[in-house]
Amino acid sequence: VRRPAFAFSAAVFFSAIPLLSARAIHAASPGKKPAQAQVLNSPAGLTEVGILDAAAYRIDVPANWNHSLVVFYHGYALRPASFHIAERLSGQQQPFFERHYAVIQSAYSQTGWALQQAYPETESLRRYFVKKYGQPRETFVAGGSMGGQLVAITLELNPKPYLGGLDLCGSVGPTYESFGHRFAMRAAFDYYFPDVMPPLVPVPADFEDTIADRDKVLTALRSNPSSAALMRNLTGLHTDLDLAHDIAYWTFVVADMQRRGGGNPFDNRNYIYTGTSSTSSASDLELNDKVKRYAAVPQARAYLMRHYTPNGHLGRPMLALHTIYDPIVQINQLALYDHEVQAAGAEENFVQQIVDREGHCNFTQNEMGDAFDEMVRWAHGGKRPTPGVLKQ
């Protein structure tokens, strides 16, 4: 039975340029000692927290450790993540720990679309773990939302330490594609609902994705049902509530990338808008004629392309799990990565599966655990999982 989308959480979400790839790998520093390290032993196992490379980290080793490791990447965070040593491991990491794997995770030294920081900082943490706790028998990589993109990055740039990876609701594929789509949709919203949201280029530096912002958008949508319907059709979102959330969230994401790139990295001048109506092309024509067009700043565009344009060369098996409807990481944005993997000749290392549920990362513990088990069997030389619906 399909369930409705649950409340959205704050944690959501390079062509791999060889120079940057090598720099990111070598930036990892296993020789550094962590700061503020604390260790707690309990009947469940050992937990260590601290600061490494300016990023908070957490290590969990179960009492009945199988001497294998899961390197975990969290998703897009609007606010800094932190770890509390006395808190029990939960969420997306729990199925791995329950299967007797050690789990390590970095909070990253920056919030937002922190691929530039997350990848080397997590690799540094992996090396620290190996140095302190010993070489694991096997190592897997997993992550949710933006963390799913980091799983793909890891298996493209540095597959050697890993046997396989699990991408949970991951925003995989070229950043310019998924974020450029969000930018274009925000521009379309401004045409239908002018002066509701702050300027798009540049987004004010102090903009925050708040409940008040979402309520403001929702009020505007409900005041003009015909334009709201055009926007829902255009974006593929099911409800005004989903659309209101995304308009505010997309604005924050655009601001994040403008800050990181040192200017606006998005360009909708050549974007052709389609899909506002299933019965007529007139509204598409009107939107394309009247929507405001923006040009990208070259240096900002270059940053967007570096972080990250995949090469598709998955060096290890990767299983991707998604809900059938995800208003944050939309399914129709994921096909391009599959095409890139096929073009790279790595299609045998990539499988996508879905569950019959709505919402972003809205999986049960059993579903995540079953998907992980499938991936491990596959990585051990077993049958390649069947694409489509996850079988339990």
Label each PLM-derived region with a short phrase:
Residues 37, 171-311:
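Accessory cap/linker subdomain of secreted extracellular hydrolases
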Residues 328-333:
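Conserved alpha/beta-hydrolase "acid-adjacent" motif
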Residues 31-64:
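N-terminal cap/lid segment of alpha/beta-hydrolase-fold proteins
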Residues 138-191:
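Primarily recognizes the serine-hydrolase "nucleophile elbow" in alpha/beta-hydrolase
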Residues 114-133:
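Alpha/beta-hydrolase active-site loop
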Residues 350-363:
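Histidine-bearing beta->alpha loop at or near hydrolase active sites
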Residues 320-322:
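Short beta-strand/loop motif that positions the catalytic acidic residue
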Residues 67-75:
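Short beta-strand element of the alpha/beta-hydrolase
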